[in-house]
């Protein structure tokens, strides 16, 4: 059983809610690039490491858009971000049907599929990952925490 991570006690630094539609996915990508590259805690980080945060958020939102509301009206998704001096916490919340992440097999990396790599990437890019139903949110929460590495962020 996966550890359920706790949302930080303080209010999120960023809260964004939007319709879960493919139309918004490029905007989410641009938003991620802008917020991660400009945040004071991350301003000294290398581009390839910042890209991993962007990819994590993008893939989490993409999965919600493509899978959470299948056979339903378009739903919504929420993005919450917390910036700490030593980590970034990303939460993507949806109100569609949930799933069991352990039921999704890891892809064959020797013969990678064209699609279906999202959850694998999210887990690999996270230092701590969980997915759970939140009664408080009344929705599904993908929670990922990424430690800010000194080696990629030149000491801070």
Where are these regions (language model features)?
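Conserved beta-strand-loop-beta-strand hairpin that lines the nucleotide-binding pocket
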Residues: 1-15, 20, 65-156
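Helix-loop-beta hinge of the Bergerat
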Residues: 10-46
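Conserved catalytic/ATP-binding subdomain
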Residues: 23, 48-51, 75
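Hydrophobic alpha-helical segments
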Residues: 26-29, 57-58, 115
């Amino acid at each position: 059983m996966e550890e359920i991570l706790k949302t930080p006690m303080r209010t999120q630094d960023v809260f964004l809610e939007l319709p879960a539609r493919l139309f918004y996915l490029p905007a989410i990508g641009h938003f991620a690039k802008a917020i991660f590259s400009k945040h004071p805690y991350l301003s000294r980080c290398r581009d390839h490491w910042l890209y991993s945060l962007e990819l994590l958020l993008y893939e989490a939102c993409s999965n919600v858009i493509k899978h959470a509301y299948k056979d339903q009206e378009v739903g919504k998704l929420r993005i919450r971000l917390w910036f700490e001096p030593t980590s970034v916490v990303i939460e993507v919340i949806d109100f569609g049907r949930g799933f069991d992440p352990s039921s999704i097999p890891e892809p064959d990396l020797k013969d990678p599929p064209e699609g279906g790599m999202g959850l694998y990437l999210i887990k690999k890019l996270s230092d701590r990952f969980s997915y759970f139903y939140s009664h408080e949110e009344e929705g599904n929460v993908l929670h990922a925490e990424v430690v800010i590495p000194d080696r990629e962020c030149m000491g801070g």
